[in-house]
UniProtKB/Swiss-Prot annotation:
NCBIfam families: mal_quin_oxido, PRK05257.2-1, PRK05257.3-2, PRK13339.1. Pathway: Carbohydrate metabolism; tricarboxylic acid cycle; oxaloacetate from (S)-malate (quinone route): step 1/1. Its EC number is 1.1.5.4. Belongs to the MQO family. The lineage of its organism: Bacteria, Bacillati, Actinomycetota, Actinomycetes, Mycobacteriales. Keywords: FAD, Flavoprotein, Oxidoreductase, Tricarboxylic acid cycle. It catalyses: (S)-malate + a quinone = a quinol + oxaloacetate. It comes from Corynebacterium jeikeium (strain K411). GO terms for molecular function: 2-hydroxyglutarate dehydrogenase activity; L-malate dehydrogenase (quinone) activity. GO terms for biological process: tricarboxylic acid cycle. The gene is mqo. Its cofactor is FAD. This is Probable malate:quinone oxidoreductase.
């Protein structure tokens, strides 16, 4: 396909975020030309591919950091919000499968129970209170709870073997949780849009983004030939993971002023021993250690990748100044500006607990990592587990006023120019799980004058569009049943 010099839409990054928007725009505006620019030679290789992330369909079914205890009560507002956004994803994927835009859904989504795990009386009391707070909510149907040692051993044999049950345990669970291969989903997205004429430029790195009247001129370098080229776009979306911050800075929009990025590297322990893999059929999330950040929540997961099952435990965090797994050690330093130095310094002073946690994680050797695993799997053996490096997670540093100046945000942040001609998604979890919801926000912020015209198509793709599913149990149940069938989860 010949390179276009001018396009309606340029998307930077060929991971699950940009490709979600590409597919969405092709449904809404099939006549718009698009180009996707990717510095690597394959899609999703930085963060979307399966061992770069946990593959959890984040819907707050089991992730305890979404249900904090505040003044003795469980606050479920974050859990409800994340769940609603994941239902948008399920509806969008179901529509695309029904329209044959996507292929076999079992290539990217599979049923795996989601389990919350508590150990010690304080955690057990918390988990029981969480269960009571969620069990009657329409978005959390069929939630189950048990503090029986026998039920624990029956459901989680790998975690029960060798465990001292004098220390009380409890679990709550949903049988209808999911494991998602976002790399496979990304490739299905790309197959769909390239068949509709979208150009994908692999091995091309964006060197600059400049205003060109009402448009944007993007300068790219072919990393194989060294050749540079330019493409002009009416609208630019930056879905480039950790590089969203530097690229928005290159664009020079005032909205990015003061923002920074705090890179955290992730690692997993992976097990592919069939004998062990068959004894664990769940994603089991525990509680983060006191003082540890939300991203440190440990979990022992079943993964389903290319039809094969494996186990994952982690995450183990580390620190590097790189903004990408395959980035530069200068990334962080190049992002420093006079305008964001107060934000960085403010976070540095406030987040001493995070600094301590990262130092401890960096110093862990394999023996220490396996010792952490044994809190979940008491009889774990080091020889059954290998260390795998995950994608970089660049947490958002948001500018705030004195006296703190900067705030570390454990989530995602959408930054867009005032005229809506350029936008970028920064941050990490829940990221890929809620990509369709995040891209709807891009459309609403950047194409507000078209939303009314697009509304019928948006409701066709996402029937709950414009509705709070938490306020409409009938619509939730209807769309849940539909997506269960469409995505082959029953």
């Amino acid at each position: 396909m010949a390179h276009k010099d001018s396009v309606d839409v340029a998307l930077i990054g060929a991971g699950v975020i940009s490709t979600t928007l590409s597919v969405m725009l092709k449904q809404l505006q099939p006549d718009w030309s698009q180009v996707i620019i990717e510095r690597l030679d394959t899609p999703g290789a930085e963060s979307s591919d399966p061992w770069n992330n946990a593959g959890t369909g984040h819907s707050a079914l089991c992730e305890l950091n979404y249900t904090p205890e505040v003044n003795g009560k469980i606050d479920i507002s974050k859990a409800v919000g994340v769940n609603e956004k994941f239902q948008v994803s399920r509806q969008f994927w179901s529509y695309l499968v029904e329209q044959n835009v996507l292929g076999d859904p079992s290539e990217f989504i599979n049923k795996v129970p989601h389990v919350s795990f508590a150990q010690g009386m304080d955690q057990v009391d918390y988990l029981k209170a969480r269960y009571e707070a969620l069990k009657d909510h329409p978005l959390f149907p069929n939630m189950q709870y048990s503090d029986s040692d026998e039920k624990f051993a029956e459901f989680l044999p790998l975690m029960a073997r060798g465990r001292d049950f004098n220390n009380p345990v409890a679990i709550s669970w949903f049988d209808e949780g999911t494991d998602i291969n976002y790399g496979a989903l990304t490739r299905q997205y790309l197959d769909a849009v390239t068949a509709q004429g979208v150009e994908v430029r692999f091995g091309n790195e964006v060197k600059n983004i400049n205003r060109d009247g009402s448009k944007w001129k993007i300068t790219t370098k072919n990393l194989h030939t060294g050749d540079t080229s330019m493409v002009t776009a009416n609208f630019v979306f930056i879905g480039a993971g950790g590089m969203a911050l530097p690229l928005l800075q290159k664009a020079g929009i005032p909205e990015i002023k003061g923002y920074g990025g705090f890179p955290v590297s992730g690692q997993w322990l992976r097990c592919t021993n069939p004998e062990l893999v068959e004894q664990h059929q769940a994603k089991v999330y525990g509680k983060a250690s006191v003082g540890a950040p939300p991203m440190s929540v440990p979990h022992l997961d079943t993964r389903v990748i290319d039809g094969k099952k494996g186990l994952l435990f982690g995450p183990y965090a580390g620190w590097t100044p790189k903004f990408l797994k395959k980035g530069s050690y200068l990334d962080l330093f190049k992002s420093l500006r006079v305008g964001n130095l107060p934000s960085y310094l403010g976070v540095g002073v406030q987040e001493m607990g995070l600094t301590k946690y990262l130092i401890e994680e960096v110093l862990k050797d394999q023996a220490a990592r396996v010792e952490s695993l044994r809190e979940y799997m008491p009889e774990a053996r080091a020889e059954d587990w290998e260390l795998v490096t995950a994608g970089q997670r660049v947490q958002v540093i948001k500018p705030i006023g004195a006296p703190k100046f900067g705030s570390l945000e454990f989530g995602t942040a959408l930054i867009n120019s005032n005229d809506g001609s350029i936008a970028g998604l920064m941050g990490a979890s829940p990221g890929a799980s809620i990509a369709p919801s995040a891209m709807l926000e891009v459309l609403e912020r950047c194409f507000g004058n078209r939303i009314a015209d697009w509304a019928p198509k948006l409701r066709e793709m996402i029937p709950s569009y414009g509705t709070r599913l938490s306020k409409d149990a009938n619509l939730f149940n209807e769309q849940w049943d539909r997506s269960q069938k469409a995505l082959k989860l029953v």
